[in-house]
Amino acid sequence: MSELSDRMGVERDFARRLSRLTARQRRELREKLGTPPDVTRVTAVDWARWEDERRQELTLILLAVILATYRQHVVELVGEQPDDATAAAAYREAVVKAAAMAAESAGSSISTARDIVMAAADVLRTGTAADVESVLVSALGPERDAVTAATATTQAQTAGTVAARLPVEAAGFNMVTRWVTEQDSKVCPLCRPLNGKVPDLWGLVLENALAPGGSRAAASVVANGGPPAHPNCRCYLRTTREPQARRVRVPG
């Protein structure tokens, strides 16, 4: 029914865990570049390895967030955990979702890091030590990790909420979701009009949004089943349950 318990604490732990990996990869990148730094010393194999490491770490983090959100919603809406078969089905779905999200995020992050490094080849070769470090932190650094953690926590929270639909329906209820924004000045003009809206209205609201990026956000929201609508999105889904309609058999 509510946002993931201690959502901001979960996000902070996510960012710290990811930053530990990123710091090690940045150190390895610095060593690979050599002295003076030369981007040709960093091979495609190196970038692929860093992407795979990031994918594996993200999969574990995201799976934990998805399952925590799922369990919270099931307890709030049903009052107890589902039977073994339903729980196993939800777990399989969570594993698949976490792996897909992690692969997309890791691929995007490392591709961007590589582009930054390659574009700064001249700066790396001729710049000061401070210049080199600035490029490396821009490519693999805590600021980008913080954005990843915020966005991916929201995405995983949505996945866990959506996964709760199966046990809720198995218990004889329909699960109704509504978009919820944070009630503060940081809410973006894309998400503000979505507050309180059910899924059938999300696409229409975003397609007609006055803020730029509405169509792109609509496609993302449909694919996710909810937030995030953009990087750093902090929105979530509020869930309620209602009795399933019963079909009355008319004697023939």
What is each of the regions a protein language model found here?
Residues 1-167, 172, 240-252:
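N-terminal leader/targeting and assembly helices and adjacent pre-domain segments
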Residues 143-250:
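Acidic, glycine-rich two-metal-ion catalytic cores of nucleic acid-processing enzymes
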